[in-house]
Amino acid sequence: MRRGFYIGRFQPYHMGHHLVLEQISREVDEIIVGIGTAQISHTVTDPFTAGERIAMIYGALRELGRWFYIIPLPDINRNAVWVSHVKSMTPPFEVVYSNNPLVVELFMEAGMEVRRPPMYRREVYSGTVIRRLMIEGGDWRQLVPDAVAKVIDEIKGVERLRNISKKDFA
Amino acid sequence: MRRGFYIGRFQPYHMGHHLVLEQISREVDEIIVGIGTAQISHTVTDPFTAGERIAMIYGALRELGRWFYIIPLPDINRNAVWVSHVKSMTPPFEVVYSNNPLVVELFMEAGMEVRRPPMYRREVYSGTVIRRLMIEGGDWRQLVPDAVAKVIDEIKGVERLRNISKKDFA
Amino acid sequence: MRRGFYIGRFQPYHMGHHLVLEQISREVDEIIVGIGTAQISHTVTDPFTAGERIAMIYGALRELGRWFYIIPLPDINRNAVWVSHVKSMTPPFEVVYSNNPLVVELFMEAGMEVRRPPMYRREVYSGTVIRRLMIEGGDWRQLVPDAVAKVIDEIKGVERLRNISKKDFA
Amino acid sequence: MRRGFYIGRFQPYHMGHHLVLEQISREVDEIIVGIGTAQISHTVTDPFTAGERIAMIYGALRELGRWFYIIPLPDINRNAVWVSHVKSMTPPFEVVYSNNPLVVELFMEAGMEVRRPPMYRREVYSGTVIRRLMIEGGDWRQLVPDAVAKVIDEIKGVERLRNISKKDFA
Amino acid sequence: MRRGFYIGRFQPYHMGHHLVLEQISREVDEIIVGIGTAQISHTVTDPFTAGERIAMIYGALRELGRWFYIIPLPDINRNAVWVSHVKSMTPPFEVVYSNNPLVVELFMEAGMEVRRPPMYRREVYSGTVIRRLMIEGGDWRQLVPDAVAKVIDEIKGVERLRNISKKDFA
Amino acid sequence: MRRGFYIGRFQPYHMGHHLVLEQISREVDEIIVGIGTAQISHTVTDPFTAGERIAMIYGALRELGRWFYIIPLPDINRNAVWVSHVKSMTPPFEVVYSNNPLVVELFMEAGMEVRRPPMYRREVYSGTVIRRLMIEGGDWRQLVPDAVAKVIDEIKGVERLRNISKKDFA
């Protein structure tokens, strides 16, 4: 049995993440999805809570009919203990999937196998692009799985993001 | 759609928990299992990491063929914000299942519906009893689902518990 | 102008505290009341939130027609920086009133003047006694100022304390 | 009885805040003034400690002859629990006064009534403007209540701000 | 080059520690002394600050004419990341010396070599015994190196310990 | 006996620091070197752990044949208690050496003597310059003591810094 670990902030979970997970699911038996910066929400770059992100990812993955672990990971703000932190919050895994240079370096220093997943249509499958479309009224729905759009609608996520991105005159 | 929330420390997950979850699963559509005191491990009362507890519960629930959310919840050490903390880390839920007086009080003050699940064979389906059996070499395996015993064996959990429960002469 | 500093947990604020503050108010121009362990609530020894304790003390002192500073002080869990912590959260003061050995030692080491206030009817003007009376249905109202009893009633404080002091069978 | 909650960083408290509080005091019975980011001081944007800010505001409000609650609120760095955090540190309140988009959003999501107070002479009644005048030797005194200027002088606040705004050649 | 790691709370550093370090110094080239629970002081079980403990140990070891690393280690309160925490605060080391069951278990799980140092006159070379002698006026000086007694006298350590061990009547 | 306190982040320790310490060592009997921001590593501005920085400084100072205290100081993120924090982690000292405006201000407000050490060849004896040379493949070795270069090589510090400074396309 072989488990892979994939981490992201998922603000929100989009088709780029989804295509990577489909790819990874062909290489390992089980996938652990770590939700990074889990403690932050209601900011312009991190609008959604960990619970909301779990609901998004869970909905998208359930459609695939596969078992996944979806685990919120609060920041620990000490890179030197971060790998231990992740390991203590997850079932054992053998391979890490990441393109983030810091994540790659930390797991490599810890002696783990790290693979770089392919990146799909990076110019639109991007949290930054999607959040900007949400604020400006563009078409973000086509960039995320349907189950994700459904969650964002239920929590009034676009309204929240627009409100908190207003200028503060205080 | 109706979700129920059930929280415990699960040190370890045992048949008492399992029977409650089977009961709850007949009352709601989806169950969120919160792993309390997620940040603590390697102590006599809390020997297992959150990741190890996730593996135990996941194994036991997968055998049931049902979807569950299993979410580690680190202590926040401020009861007055604890309900908000839980809500931010979980998908929305409508009913709480707990017999813990503090959990009941906090969710009641927050205006949530709280139900008391039945408790099964409390004299043996008990984390305290099971950990003592582990230390003393008793038969703890019959008190937990098979998938849980398998995880505890893989991580050498009994050996760990015995080691850390030795007297400190320092 | 001369300010005095008086600290307590005030779980709840009672006539013993009140008599001390009346005494202190004859010695200094302004009194700063520090609410210790401000972050804790909903426990058997610390049932009330900082906000609830502020409301209690404020009500009791307003009846006296005097100006007071009432300042919540979260624990910092590092005694060596605690005096700096207190000073950073309060207007400047010249004298400390306390009978707590640790508070006395920390302010003495910091070179501050410390006075021991008289203690009144210690066998009943005591948070421990009052909380026990609340749980057991005894007459706690005569031991606190009227304004305090009013706040405790409004927040259903006795019911909360009784609920959280129930035995946990989980 | 109706209480209003007004929050700011008050670095320093100025006439813009003061005019808002005068306005609010006509709408509610009691005002709770929350001092945000209470734990930070000695920086270019947040030069004053919570205790110093309490002294400033207290002095200004006492001149009005009204009762106010002035409560330091340390950051909790988790927006999703911030409203609970505020509520646990304050007496109960019914209406929030704020123009800060995040504060507005968080209290709105919590189902509270939020009002936008008028803003007065925003181009000069501004902490940023006042701190710049302090550094550059301009006339900041006319922009704050007399009691505030007195506190700033006593703590040598302008000297502190100038010192810490020097370039670091280290 | 081979480094050994030895950890204790050193409240205070006594002849038992000293004899162990002399023993260890014959087995490795360099010794790293970790001061555990570095953030705590002014309590009955942990009266001395990390800085005071560094001064004690430094004085005792300098008399030996050997190079040592003396490193304060604040508690991190998460056993699962503790080894990473220690490693990030220390130069690389190859062998751990400890009789503490938890320390032994954590380093063993991390795959490190752990040795049990001999324990000398455990009935008197004991922090608990020495602190009790300090409180009761017994002869503690013969149980610590001279340099340690000198530091304790300079900081008035015995007076502090007696003061904070008084009963709290508050 | 007179001790001086010198603080820096030492990312990495370089000849500028070394020349200052040589200068200070002529003015005081013992030097305490505080390693600031000790908890941070593996970032572009703070690549090295506290333990790695201790090894660097220790190696450089041992060549001088002098006794030094080298003490990691985690950030406390509350300037108003920072001086107390430093004092609790260090042996007593009488004079502070710093050119950092905030450090100077905080120790001055605490009534300590502060001296400004001379700065040597600031245009190259600079952590920023040295880290940029490391990334770009320039000659950084001549700017640090030999013992420091040796440690950086052993931990593959340049490779780490280059890896984590790559652009994140995630």
UniProtKB/Swiss-Prot annotation, chains A, B, C, D, E, F:
Q: What's the EC number here?
A: 2.7.7.1
- One Pfam match, given by its short name, reads CTP_transf_like
Which UniProt keywords are listed? ATP-binding, Cytoplasm, NAD, Nucleotide-binding, Nucleotidyltransferase, Pyridine nucleotide biosynthesis, Transferase
The pathway that the record names for this protein is: Cofactor biosynthesis; NAD(+) biosynthesis; NAD(+) from nicotinamide D-ribonucleotide: step 1/1
Q: Name one GO molecular function term.
A: ATP binding
User: Catalysed reaction per UniProt?
Assistant: beta-nicotinamide D-ribonucleotide + ATP + H(+) = diphosphate + NAD(+)
Highest taxon listed in the record's lineage: Archaea
Q: Name one GO cellular component term.
A: cytoplasm
Q: Is the keyword Zinc in the record?
A: no
The Gene Ontology biological process terms listed for this entry are: NAD biosynthetic process
| Predominant localisation class | cytoplasm
Q: Which family does it belong to?
A: Belongs to the archaeal NMN adenylyltransferase family.
Family annotation (NCBIfam families):
arch_NMN_Atrans, cyt_tran_rel, PRK01153.1
Protein name per the record: Nicotinamide-nucleotide adenylyltransferase
Origin species: Methanothrix thermoacetophila (strain DSM 6194 / JCM 14653 / NBRC 101360 / PT)
What phylogenetic lineage does the species belong to? Answer: Archaea, Methanobacteriati, Methanobacteriota, Stenosarchaea group, Methanomicrobia
